[in-house]
Structures are given as structure tokens and as C-alpha cells.
Amino acid sequence: MAAETKALIFAANILTLPTFMRLPLFILILAFTFTSCSKFAKVQKSTDYDYKLRMAEKYYVAKKYNNAQQLYEELFPIYKGQPQFEDLFYKYAYCSYYLKDWLQAENLFKQFTEVFPTSQKAEEMEYMRAYTYYRQSPKAELDQTNTQKTIGLMQTFINTHPGSTRLKEANDIIDKSREKLEQKEVKSAVLYYNMGHYLAAGIAYSSLMNNFPDSKNSEEYKLQVIKSYYLYARNSIDEKKAERYEKVLSECNDFTDRFPDNPLAKDVERYRNLSQSNIKEIQNEQAKKTD
């Protein structure tokens, strides 16, 4: 934790002290903060670049990333092409990462691999670039562009570095990202169903099965397809009901083929029987009309 941050926390704690004790301590904190800022200002003004680089390293090690970042940025054009530049670039990129400036960090990690493609740190930078997208991935309800980019870049990393020690981490992140995409689609399907848009719900649940064939919830999605199409058929105009109940039967048969001896088979059988009964009733009504 940076000294300035500790000082601010300490200042907040002072407010709980008796009034007569607060002023001396506030003065002490202000003096400490002013001294720290004054010292950094002197470093910035220095024209001794080696000294500034040493101080940047010192701030970096002390986790004062904001100070380190400012110095590295000033030194960037000075050391470009020099032996120190690779390490400077590496730490400059990480400053943005530790400051949670994900967009800047992603850009710098990418640039590092372009400037130093044969560096021993290039593999790490490729991984970190993908990881910054993962850190930007929002809740399932929101746009999942960054989640999709995470999956794409992590998969590229795995393909490019099959012997990397980071493979397990990369695969775990892909799995978590895919779970989030799946969750987003589930929420959409549930919303359609709850709103009574049963055709849209049936299509959405079918898409879930196609998009996530290895999902542990595939059987439940298939049952929801059946339920959605059944309710769609039941609420249809008379002329369309029979063919839509046939669609339910087709989905029931598909469930049996895909998931034999599944515990949900009883529910599927109920919708099969209901659909068959309704089709038979429709056929009987049609037969009466022709008599």
C-alpha cells in the first residue's frame, strides 16, 4: 500500500479521536504528504536519466505505480533502443495493469509483443493481454464483447504456446468465460418464457444446446424447448395447433434419443402424452365436421 494511501486511511481514523488531538496529527500528515510530493517533483525535474530510472524502479518495487508510471513514460523515448528499454517497457505496461487501466494495459502488452517478439517475456505479455479482456468482462446481463475477446485470445495463446505453464489458467478462464456467455443466453431464454413469447423461448433454448453442447444443463434446456413449444402450440389458432403439437412430439423423440434413461424423461413423457391427446382431439373434431 502506498504511503499516501496509508496517510489517508490514518487521516480518516483521526476523525474518531478527541478534538484536541486532531490538529497536531493533521499537521503531521500534511507535512508527510507535502514532503513525499516534493521529493517526487524533484525526481521529475532531474535531468539525470539513470537516476530517474533507478527511482522509477524504486517506486515500482514499493508499489507506487502512479509515480513509477509517470517516470517510465518520461523515460520511454530516452531509452528506446537501449538495453534497458525492454525491462522499462515491461514494467511500464504492468503499471497500467496494477492501476486497473485495462485498456491502456492491453494496448501496452500487445505493443510489447510487437516490439520484442523474441523476448522471454513475450509469452507472458500475450497471456496478460488476454487476461486484461477477462478483467473487463462485465456481468452476464451486459454486452459480452470483452468476454468473447477473452475466449479468442486465450485460445490463440493455448494454440501458440502448447507447452506453457499457463495452459491450465488459460483453459480455466475460457471455461469461466463460456459459462458467462451461457448464463447470458439462459437469462434471455427465461425472459422470453416468462413474458409468454414461447416460440422465441423455444428457439432460444435450442440455440443454447447448439452453442453449448457440453453444458451440464443440456437436458434441462431440452425440456424447456419441449415446454416452450407445447405452450406455443396450446396458445395457437386452431388451424395451426396440430402441426405445432407435432413439433412437440418431434422434440420429445429427440430428447429420448439424446438422453435415454434420464430422470427428466417422466416430464417429457407427460408432454408427449398431452400433445398426442390434443392431436387426437383435433382430428376427432375435424372428422365430425366432415361427417
Task: State where each predicted segment sits.
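Sec-dependent bacterial lipoprotein signal peptides
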Residues: 2-37
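Acidic, polar-rich low-complexity tracts and alpha-helical solenoid repeat scaffolds
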Residues: 11, 25, 34-291
